[in-house]
From Swiss-Prot:
Gene encoding the protein: thrS
Cofactor: Zn(2+)
Name of this protein: Threonine--tRNA ligase
Origin organism lineage: Bacteria, Pseudomonadati, Pseudomonadota, Alphaproteobacteria, Hyphomicrobiales
Record-linked NCBIfam families: thrS
Reaction(s) catalysed (UniProt annotation): tRNA(Thr) + L-threonine + ATP = L-threonyl-tRNA(Thr) + AMP + diphosphate + H(+)
Length: 658
């Protein structure tokens, strides 16, 4: 019995088909060249194998190598080829899982002898052989009994465990590539040959089965793959550049911070690192003041009862650090927790004292220190820690004020990123997930407002801000905006958020009195610009490769002497520079000037002013900029005039120049 489906194509055309043709047959009906290039097809946003029949009407697209969605298919197939190569080369190795991740893929293997970096070269060679064989991917659907029996016979105990964990009503799909097969949901491309040669195995690491330290340790092989060689080369070059810019290495060289075993994920800030951190806070404090935020501070330790009301105790307890009063055991009901988030405390501040509609919008901000438990293996310098500071704010407003508040937040976020040199920003709106609080009418209303705001932002930016909508990706308590910035070497960092919350005001019975003297629940907006300030500082260090803008540098200027004859002049010069607000350090050490210059350059000091006998006699300096070999002779007045504006933060510069 034939089935009629109506398909809409990307060019706007529509066509009816009177049989359950496959995706490949559809591609062939359009053109032979398209069928040859086709990797998969998308029906109503869901990517499927080309061998799958088209059983329903909707929006259809044939995915080729040029499509951005092809990258996930290429990497997914590459992970399967990696697993086959390993089992060909190292019989007895068990395969476990091999997902696609950001910028690549990995596969975890169970083997008595862990793999080494030398093994990767051999495995990669075998992968190229398998790809060259150009074996078709073929899907079969098995019963649970059959899958269990076959994988048990193969000695694949981890696969058997996975089979047992799959819900009874879910199909068990197995994909073949030649004789080798693996349990997999799919989809896959037509054959291994479509993977191409633009891939590379990157590293070996240990990983616990299912991420649980109580389970066996596996060996994880990481790899990456791209649609073409040029993209692979560009990515590998970016990794080389990222290694040079690694904030952990620069943090040591610049003497900014360190970590110790006694405090995993806890930062020991040194003088210059702490100065940089304070520069970040001072900048944001001024911006908050300009946008009428009230800065507050809520307790770091609160009773579990508050976290139970907020829902954190139920949903986030495993990531919270708990505390108890002295001499009381853990079974005691009187348990406290270090705050993992600032929002419950801010709701308490809003609730303190009766609020009228005339008090709204109320904007509450805090540089709130939070503690969150992260597994030790996931800790990564400033980027992933257990204790960090959020530039957190919460806005309580009326429904009518929501759009204006979102636009106000957007202006603050974009201008902040621009002040730090980030020009390429993307903005995503995440909408309702399946599991959520609040009525459909409430979500409809909120999403309509935020979509309108999104269009306004896109129009105002003249297309410079890339916007998109992510259906189903919102939090259970409200839709959200996510701001992602691109750094100097093309990496993307998600930082800012604007998150609506239908949940907390209701849980805590937060209200205001409207103009009709009725109690109303306020609209609550969670807002962050930097997110984790420590992480943002790590991003800045890597973005600038430690060469911070003069206004943000922890040490702006060093005055270095060539000879002791210039010491008195250098002291007076340092005092004068400090008097006009320039952060200046004096170096009178009895060392050669080239040694001093090299040392301060390694410390990434933006400006070095060299003073010798000639400079002291002519009231001048020899100025050297970080990264330049040029020597510029200037009078002291010229130096001050040139550096003072540059050393002024951009937000203050705007006020001065207004």
């Amino acid at each position: 019995m034939s089935c009629s489906v109506s398909l809409s194509f990307p060019d706007g055309s529509k066509r009816d088909y009177h049989s359950e043709m496959t995706g490949l047959e559809l591609a062939e009906s359009i053109s032979k060249s398209l069928a040859k290039k086709a990797l998969a097809y998308s029906l109503n946003g869901i990517i499927r194998d080309l061998s799958d029949p088209i059983k329903q009407s909707g929006q259809i697209e044939i995915i080729t190598r040029e499509d951005t969605r092809a990258l996930e298919l290429i990497r997914h197939d590459c992970a399967h080829v990696l697993a086959e190569a390993v089992q060909e080369l190292f019989p007895g190795t068990q395969v476990t899982i091999g997902p696609v991740i950001e910028n690549g893929f990995y596969y975890d293997f169970a083997r008595q002898q862990p793999f080494t970096l030398d093994d990767l070269t051999i495995i990669e060679k075998k992968m190229r052989e398998i790809i060259q064989r150009n074996k078709p991917f073929r899907k079969e659907v098995w019963s649970r009994k059959k899958a269990r029996e076959i994988f048990s016979e193969k000695g694949e105990l981890y696969k058997v465990e996975l089979i047992d964990s799959i819900p009874d009503n879910q199909d068990l799909k197995v994909y073949y590539q030649g004789d080798w097969f693996d349990l997999c949901r799919g989809p896959h491309m037509q054959s291994t040959g479509q993977i191409g040669n633009a891939f590379k195995l990157m590293k070996v690491a240990g990983a616990y089965w299912r991420g649980d330290a109580n389970n066996p340790m596996l060996t994880r092989i990481y790899g990456t793959a791209f649609a073409n060689e040029n993209d692979l080369k560009a990515y590998l070059h970016m990794l080389e550049e990222a290694e040079k810019r690694d904030h952990r290495r620069l943090g040591r060289e610049m003497n900014l911070f360190h970590f110790q075993e006694e405090g995993p994920g806890m930062i020991f800030w040194h003088k210059k690192g702490w100065k940089m951190f304070q520069n970040l806070i001072n900048y944001m404090r001024r911006r908050l003041d300009d946008h009428q935020y009230a800065e507050v501070n809520a307790p770091q330790v609160l009773d579990r009862s508050l976290w139970e009301i907020s829902g954190h105790w139920e949903w986030y307890k495993e990531n919270m650090f708990k505390a108890i009063p002295a001499a009381e055991d853990w079974d005691n009901e009187n348990v406290y927790a270090l705050k993992p988030m600032n929002c419950p405390g801010h709701v308490q501040i809003f609730k303190h004292g009766l609020k009228s509609y005339r008090d709204l919008p109320t904007r509450i901000a805090e540089f709130g220190v939070v503690h969150r438990y992260e597994p030790s293996g996931s800790l990564h310098g400033l980027m992933r820690v257990r204790c960090f500071t959020q530039d957190d704010a919460h806005i309580f407003c009326t429904d009518e004020q929501l759009a204006d508040e979102c636009l106000n937040i957007n202006d603050l976020i974009l201008s902040t990123y621009a002040d730090f040199g980030f020009k390429e920003i993307s903005l995503k709106l995440s909408t309702r997930p399946e599991k959520r609080v609040g009525s459909d009418a409430l979500w409809d209303h909120a999403e309509n407002i935020m979509e309108s705001v999104l269009k306004t932002i896109e129009t105002k930016s003249a297309g410079q801000i890339k916007t998109s909508i992510l259906p189903g990706e919102g939090a259970f308590y409200g839709p959200k905006f996510e701001y992602t910035l691109k750094d100097a070497i093309g990496r993307e960092w998600q930082c800012g958020t604007t998150q609506l919350d239908f949940n907390l005001p209701e849980r805590f019975n937060a209200f205001y009195i409207d103009k009709d003297s009725e109690k109303r629940q306020p609209v609550m907006i969670h807002r962050a610009i930097f997110g984790s300030m420590e992480r943002f500082l790590g991003i800045l260090i890597e973005n600038f490769s430690g060469h911070m803008p003069l206004w943000f540098a922890p040490e702006q200027i060093v005055v270095a002497t060539i000879t002791s004859e210039a010491n008195e002049y250098a002291k007076k010069l340092t005092a004068k520079l400090k008097s006009v607000g320039l952060s200046t350090t004096l170096d009178l050490r009895n060392e050669k000037i080239n040694y001093k210059i090299r040392e301060h350059s390694l410390q990434k000091v933006p400006v070095i002013l060299v003073c010798g006998k000639r400079e002291s006699e002519t009231n001048s300096v020899n100025m050297r900029r970080l990264g330049s070999t040029e020597q510029i002779f200037l009078s002291v007045e010229e130096v001050i005039e040139q550096l003072k504006n540059e050393a002024t933060p951009p937000d203050l510069r705007r006020v001065i120049n207004a």
